[in-house]
Amino acid sequence: MGQKVHPHGLRVGVIKDWDAKWYADKKNFADNLIEDQQIRKFIKKELFSAGIAKIEIERSAKRVKLNIHTAKPGVIIGKGGSGIERLKASLKNIIAEKNVLINIVEVKNAETNAQLMAENIAAQLEKRISFRRAMKQTIQRAMKAGTLGVKTACSGRLGGAEIARTEQYNEGTIPLQTIRADIDYGFAEADTTYGKIGVKVWVYNGEVLPTKKVEKKEEANA
């Protein structure tokens, strides 16, 4: 069977950027990597209702900066910034002996963000809404918002069926093999009474073309 490469990993360094922006030697690399995973897992669990699309981590010698991309910045910031301070205090258990800086980045259009779309479908499945209805409505909203193509897939015991299967719906174009194509990808899991259901979403936002340098040629006066 044909397998699909991760759309983000395929494009890193070409049109996509790294989510972890730091360098470490062999001695500290594994510790930093595990710490990154723990930070992401903790923030996702603690602030699930805030609609977190992405967490970027930047490191220096004595500082860790977190860029949290969220659809609901007010939920994280809290009244007078109390939410940020509370989050910093909680992260001290994971990040030892380093200053923590938290930067909140607002996701302006949650309906076209693949990760938030996947989490939205998963949340609907947990509320016993039909997977077909959840996927089709999400696709319709994204297409209305101006995306060029959307593809969704749900895998597991759909509708409580005894045999697990995968169902997909798509609209528009999704050029997965085109490196310059800006493909956003999201994954989420729904915990249902019949087990887990995996949700994948691909969103095509157009091509990212290199900027052409226009050289102005001055005509020599005769």
Swiss-Prot record:
Keyword Cell membrane: no
GO cellular component, one term: cytosolic small ribosomal subunit
GO process terms (BP): translation
Superkingdom, natural source: Bacteria
Pfam families: KH_2 (PF07650), Ribosomal_S3_C (PF00189)
Keywords in alphabetical order: Ribonucleoprotein, Ribosomal protein, RNA-binding, rRNA-binding
Alphabetical list of SMART domains matching this protein: KH
KH type-2 domain segment(s): 39-108
CDD domains noted in UniProt: KH-II_30S_S3
Function summary: Binds the lower part of the 30S subunit head. Binds mRNA in the 70S ribosome, positioning it for translation.
Similarity comment text for this entry: Belongs to the universal ribosomal protein uS3 family.
Assembly behavior: Part of the 30S ribosomal subunit. Forms a tight complex with proteins S10 and S14.
PANTHER family per UniProt: 30S/40S RIBOSOMAL PROTEIN S3, SMALL RIBOSOMAL SUBUNIT PROTEIN US3C
Name of this chain's protein: Small ribosomal subunit protein uS3
